[in-house]
Amino acid sequence: MYRTNTCGELRLSHLQQTVTLCGWVQRVRRMGGMTFVDLRDRYGTTQLVFNRDSAPAELCDRAEDLGREWVIRATGTVMERSSKNPNIPTGDIEIAVGEMDVLNRSEVPPFTIEDETDGGDDLRMKYRYLDLRRHCVRSNMELRHRMALEVRKYLDGEGFLEVETPMLIKSTPEGARDFVVPSRMNPGQFYALPQSPQTFKQLLMVSGFDRYFQIVKCFRDEDLRADRQPEFTQIDCEMSFVEQEDVLSTFEGMAKHLFRTIRHVEISEAFPRMTWHDAMKYYGSDKPDTRFDMRFVELMDVLKGHDFSVFDSAAYIGGICAKGAGSYTRKQLDALTDFVKRPQVGAKGMVYARVESDGSVKSSVDKFYTQETLQELRRTMEAEPGDLILILSGDDLMKTRKQLCELRLEVGSQLGLRDKNKFSCLWVVDFPLFEWDEETKRFYAMHHPFTSPKPEDIPLLDTDPGAVRANAYDMVINGVEVGGGSIRIHDSALQQKMFELLGFTPEKAQEQFGFLMNAFKYGAPPHGGLAYGLDRWVSLFAGLDSIRDCIAFPKNNAGRDVMIDAPSVIDEAQLQELFLELIPNEN
């Protein structure tokens, strides 16, 4: 037996017991004739003591020579610490060591293995196996495990079966780019890695598996950002014989179960619901952060027609009221203007108005507006003395709302309104079924081609497809879309109509999705489902800024695994075996 206990479990109740611990040397401290070693494993840290008054000199000499991250085994007696450490669970005890074996030496690590480390992101990703030794990173993995366990418990209790679906599938043209895999046995043909198990879970519904789930890897070849990775994990679910209310109730229940068991937060009230139209109108986003108010107010009627050309020519003028932010300095306001002018936001400028203590309004465009008009602005914004009104305008309504959304989030962060330990949950419903692409002059599915239109909107498919609402829904928490889904089309004729509107010829639809349309001919039940992003859930509960920090071996923002140096070139022999030839990149 290598060890009798872990480095996180010993307490005063274990005094005078002889124990054996194994782990990594966190740090070594020498004080007079004593050497203190902090020994760390997955479970915690325990202090070891090598005392020259009671331990062999040879043992104490070896203890002094220990280096950081050496792997050792130590046997000794549990003693009460004279100088206790209240910051760790084992802080009341220490081990008076009588025997020690060095199991493996370590080179000096390239960064400190501490919560507050001196290693940058790139260096820590290159040595991810060392980064995972840090308590803060390891705790994210433990949280991920507990959440996956609770998901399985809840869904099993609701009668769901966990069923695995294939990883090598057929490539489809909709959505993000596929990762493709050449087939050696079928020259010139390719598999794709699944962007989701969408079609397979629908086939499982046709097969009679009325409640399915799996925690599954998915792959999308798209540009990366803080909440995206080329491979990510979904909690994928589907149900038969359900309407939208059944799905929302089931998975709202799962969310509440996770809050209760993981965060110890009891949520009794139903999640609010907001239409997509209202989310875009009042927040400029289909995933609004409702931890704080600051809703958009349209100001076209108030501010147009006063010889201020920026507003007079605008297709949209919108404002937010930042309560209590009237004390913002000119420097802070200039910084906000610079923020909205950044290429990532794209606004041309920002107008502000401050409500003074006497109720008067002072703005950055006073020469164009009378105090009477500014008071009308104040009333429209419901602003009070000490408040700050921030206004953006533009010639594209949707684009300007998105810019105002970025400004709202930035101001909310500056005012401390986006507390990571406060949670605001809601459902966003009634999405458009289609979105129009001006460049290609065609409709695209806002979610995917299998999303059902709302029954009352089906007649509009022939007359006004852009007005059709989808039977789709997203769960949003703190401005993060943690999950989304829809009621699916289960009728072959309606599915064919959907393909036509998306520009598929009957031949193309049959080639891409014939297997699904054929299955629908054999008694497909009404069905719908939802997929949660496990990575996003974990990062939300852990208070992380990026999902990368809750994935054991993530990719960087260029989609590379710098630890194993992937992707990489392959041998010419492998290329020939796969009937592939590389074309030089002329860029």
Swiss-Prot record:
GO molecular function: aspartate-tRNA ligase activity; ATP binding; nucleic acid binding
Chief place where the protein resides: cytoplasm
Entry similarity comment: Belongs to the class-II aminoacyl-tRNA synthetase family. Type 1 subfamily.
Top EC category: ligase
EC number: 6.1.1.12
Subcellular location as annotated: Cytoplasm
Subunit structure of this chain's protein: Homodimer.
Entry's Gene Ontology cellular component terms: cytoplasm
UniProt xrefs under PANTHER family: ASPARTATE--TRNA LIGASE, MITOCHONDRIAL, ASPARTYL/LYSYL-TRNA SYNTHETASE
Reaction catalysis annotation: tRNA(Asp) + L-aspartate + ATP = L-aspartyl-tRNA(Asp) + AMP + diphosphate
Binding positions (L-aspartate): E174, R220, H447, R488
Cystine bridges: none
Function: Catalyzes the attachment of L-aspartate to tRNA(Asp) in a two-step reaction: L-aspartate is first activated by ATP to form Asp-AMP and then transferred to the acceptor end of tRNA(Asp).
InterPro entries, per database record: Aa-tRNA-synt_II (IPR004364), aa-tRNA-synth_II (IPR006195), aa-tRNA-synth_II/BPL/LPL (IPR045864), Asp-tRNA-ligase_1 (IPR004524), Asp-tRNA-ligase_1_N (IPR047089), Asp/Asn-tRNA-synth_IIb (IPR002312), AspRS_core (IPR047090), GAD-like_sf (IPR004115)
Species lineage: Bacteria, Pseudomonadati, Bacteroidota, Bacteroidia, Bacteroidales
Claim: Amino-acid biosynthesis is one of the keywords in the record: no
Protein name: Aspartate--tRNA ligase
UniProtKB keywords: Aminoacyl-tRNA synthetase, ATP-binding, Cytoplasm, Ligase, Nucleotide-binding, Protein biosynthesis
List of residues binding ATP: R220, D221, E222, Q229, E481, G533, L534, D535, R536
GO annotation terms (biological process): aspartyl-tRNA aminoacylation
Top-level taxon of origin: Bacteria
Residue ranges, annotated region (Aspartate): 198-201
